[in-house]
Amino acid sequence: MPTHNAVPKPCQARTRRFAACLMMAAWLLGAAHAAHADQALWELGLGLGTLSVPHYRGSDQNHHWVLPVPYVVYRGDIFRSDREGTRAVLLDTERVDLDLSLGGTPPARSRDNRARTGMPDLAATLEIGPKLNLRLGQGAGWKLDLRLPLRAAIAAEDHPKSVGWTLSPVLNLDVQWQGWNLGLQGGPMAAGRAYNAYFYDVTATQATPVRSAYAARSGYAGWGATTAATRRVGNWWLAGFWRYDSVAGATLARSPLVTQRSNQTFGVALSWVFKVSDARVPDRP
């Protein structure tokens, strides 16, 4: 079976689980955190979680993992990992801020995916790029932002390679309610030709009687919405999220590798926060 790389199988398994751990930590840590007058500069913890995620958007098969979940919060002036996600802050004002943000997708083995049988494996991707955040409104216990992330994507193969770009603007609402920190966001997605091709192209040599050749185009890539909740009780941190994705009407929807028009992703985790810095920093609204 052809693959994108020649990493030994035990290493591939470790890579898949490591990528899944990072993805789950990013989704959950970026969900919401409580606001206080001042907070610890950093916090460390470790827990356990479960994650269900599609092999790729438009796939009718899912990964199901039980994973260790690292809890890492850092509230520095430039580098931060908190309720806004993991990023490097480039500009920070009351209404507008600009940061360098991260994203990614999990790996998938073609032998585990019926639609991709005999095709190259999908490596995990790392997405990185600028994100412009515009504060639209704020009140007691809530805030509404428009977030505009534009990211370059890199496939984590033996020799990492660029696989294009993604743009996924979202409206993001954060709410504090009875000790819970709730987040809701959603918006459309767009991607370049190389990004869509990595996931959805079928070359002439990969075509079969039930899988026609297909060349992806750039453009509209569907939409997604995520809801999440977290709560801190003493040194315990509980978090969960649910995401809905749709590729209906997307330029990639006619690929034979798209076997359903919508996907759901969800995860829950419980972590024990075992170390907190003595240094304190003011909360950033």
Where are these regions (language model features)?
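Short glycine/proline- and aromatic-enriched beta-strand/turn motifs that initiate or cap beta-hairpins
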Residues: 36-80, 275, 285
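Outer-envelope beta-barrel architecture signal
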Residues: 38-44, 64-66, 77-79, 92-98, ...
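Residues on the lipid-exposed face of transmembrane beta-strands in outer-membrane beta-barrel proteins
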Residues: 48-52, 68-74, 85-90, 128-134, ...
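Sequence/structural signature of outer-membrane beta-barrel proteins
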Residues: 51-57, 105-111, 135-139, 151-158, ...
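Outer-membrane beta-barrel translocator domains and adjoining extracellular loop/strand segments
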Residues: 57-62, 111-116, 157-164, 195-203, ...
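Outer-membrane beta-barrel transmembrane domain signature
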Residues: 158-237, 245-248
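Predominantly the C-terminal beta-signal and adjacent terminal strand-loop region
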Residues: 228-285
